[in-house]
């Protein structure tokens, strides 16, 4: 693609995303489906603005690559070892069972048995990009079903390697004298990557971080991700698997959070590009010609995968309320099918329009997943938010709560327990189905669903409540909820959780003055106890704590987020000197007056 054409394509992608995604969000169908529809609109079968879909689709796989790197950063080797049963048990069972059933059906549809095997394996895979994005949107990351879903996706990525190796064997084009030397060299190169990454990555990033230039650190992070992807691609392995391993190798390093922050903006844009590219690849001509065949194929594919996943979730012990979410979020075909079917086509395994039909089926199945998840959410909301079926009265009898607590993680639990202990009428909103079921057993008045939906807030009593306490894990959800409350429920007194100074600045800029940084108060309290243990009088330690809190808050309100680390360091040094002067004056005052305080703990 020429430079001018590439620039034009970039402008079209951005325009399509900016136009389609907000519209999709307003219609309530989700950002992923918005990207897919945008791709259909600008692709060769829509308005025809872009025709070179294959090249763009290959480039857009970088979105999945960046996503897998961030996932790897969140998992250390010990955590992966804990997931071994679900990865190689449930994951393997899902691929084998789904592939066997789907291959049998393809043989009944006049596919050669070799093509049916490849088709069954390709259709058995799910979309890593779509599933992880939807799991994040639906708050499944912390749930048991979300962890199991990730394990299944990870096994599918591992299964890419033998699946691609199987294609030439099925086509009968494999060399009679298997090149063991080439295989051994690939294994050796993979081992070198693991060992080298284990012992070299941290010293390299330590050297780069010492330069103090943020842009160089970001460039080094991009270099690592793209190099790992290119290296694995050269070995004939999954690019996403390579970057996932690189992320795991750095999961226990001190640079984990900085690496994640550097990659996150690129991941979001490239994932959007990936979904747009998938939409562009939808062959509407084949769809029109074989409409009934394709429609039946999509339904059969989704139903078979959902039944398989639901059965495995039940055998694994997942709660009944979470099984439907788990089964539906992995029910689509995946991006790996494009690679596998293209490889099989080059080996002449498919006949006529068979490959085109399979690709259309995969693409449409990906489009059904957001709608299916939305339907599952509505069903769960009616089931979990309806009237109590038993005769026991809930702890909260008043339909008009004083406070709405959004999120019932460790942070939200403490707040809710304190409010309930003081006889406050509260309602809790939570997206984790397991947490909802547990809370209801203990008599909490709780609603399941996404708190960023206006109707759910109304059902929870937002129009009559006095305050809302936002304890979301994701800062994006917090800011979205703040804007929603300010627009639709301006009478609510908003109190929020901030994960750090960046989120605190965002809340202040949005007009929220009542917030708590999740580690700040506990760290201050432990610091006060440390001062007392070193011989400082409890009263003096308490005053030191209050001074520090007051000065830090003043800095927080007055310090605009700076891009320069040196400016931040300079401001911090000034604040430290000011704090030392305050403490010196306090100590002189303490010596002049007798203090009657005693330790009261």
Swiss-Prot record:
Membrane disposition: Multi-pass membrane protein
Places the protein is found: Cell inner membrane
Keyword annotations of the record: Antiport, Cell inner membrane, Cell membrane, Ion transport, Membrane, Potassium, Potassium transport, Transmembrane, Transmembrane helix, Transport
UniProt xrefs under InterPro entries: Cation/H_exchanger_TM (IPR006153), K/H_exchanger (IPR004771), K_H_efflux_KefB (IPR020884), K_uptake_TrkA (IPR006036), Na+/solute_symporter_sf (IPR038770), NAD(P)-bd_dom_sf (IPR036291), RCK_N (IPR003148)
A GO BP annotation: proton transmembrane transport
Domain RCK N-terminal intervals: 400-519
Highest taxon above the source species: Bacteria
NCBIfam families in the record: 2a37, PRK03659.1
Role, per record: Pore-forming subunit of a potassium efflux system that confers protection against electrophiles. Catalyzes K(+)/H(+) antiport.
Name of the featured protein: Glutathione-regulated potassium-efflux system protein KefB
Recorded name of the encoding gene: kefB
